Amino acid sequence: MKQLLDFLPLVIFFAVYKFFDIYIASGALIAATALQLVVTYALYKKLEKMHLITFAMVTVFGTLTLVFHDDAFIKWKVTIIYALFALALGVSQLLNKSILKSMLGKEMKVADNIWAHVTWYWVSFFAICGLVNIYVAFSLPLETWVNFKVFGLTALTLINTVITVFYLYKHLPEDQRKELK
């Protein structure tokens, strides 16, 4: 259920864009992201920092898109969010306080160097996605960027999540691997 809620704003953005335009879709994205926060809090009685940061970015860049009637702001939002994720992961790793380990370390007992590999992998992934977003957003038609944002980045994130799970599984202690089978 939680993962479905994460996709709600993206689905609404895409649908509204297809029926209207980027400006109405940007307004719908702000509203859908706010709704996501309300529903998530109502169901789980807590909000994750990632959701709050995303909501803040969506609100700021969506509002700028609407006020200035310029889709460049909503396009930059994607890159800035990915840059913030890469920065947060990278800094946490440099401080030996891996965010990924703190999120998943209780369920997956792997060595610190494995968490470091996974963290730097995701730092690289987010940085590359942010750069590719800039290229697609400002070199290709708007329709292409919307499809890339909704389908391309989502697919890439899911693929990288699966790769990460397999990598972590490979490095789990044998007794923990047996528990997961």
Curated annotation (Swiss-Prot):
**Which Pfam families is this protein grouped with?**
IspA
Per the record's keyword annotation, is Hydrolase included, yes or no? no
**Alphabetized UniProt keyword annotations:** Cell inner membrane, Cell membrane, Membrane, Transmembrane, Transmembrane helix
Q: What's the main place this protein lives?
A: membrane
Q: Domain of life, per the record?
A: Bacteria
What InterPro entries does its record include? YciB
> Per UniProt, what is the membrane topology?
Multi-pass membrane protein
Q: Transmembrane stretches, by residue range?
A: 10-30, 50-70, 72-92, 118-138, 148-168
Q: Does the keyword Protease apply?
A: no
Disulfide pairs? none
- Assigned GO CC terms: plasma membrane
UniProt subcellular location: Cell inner membrane
UniProt function note: Plays a role in cell envelope biogenesis, maintenance of cell envelope integrity and membrane homeostasis.
Per the record, the similarity remark reads: Belongs to the YciB family.
Spell out the protein name for this chain: Inner membrane-spanning protein YciB
UniProt organism field? Shewanella oneidensis (strain ATCC 700550 / JCM 31522 / CIP 106686 / LMG 19005 / NCIMB 14063 / MR-1)
As recorded in Swiss-Prot or TrEMBL, the protein's gene is named: yciB
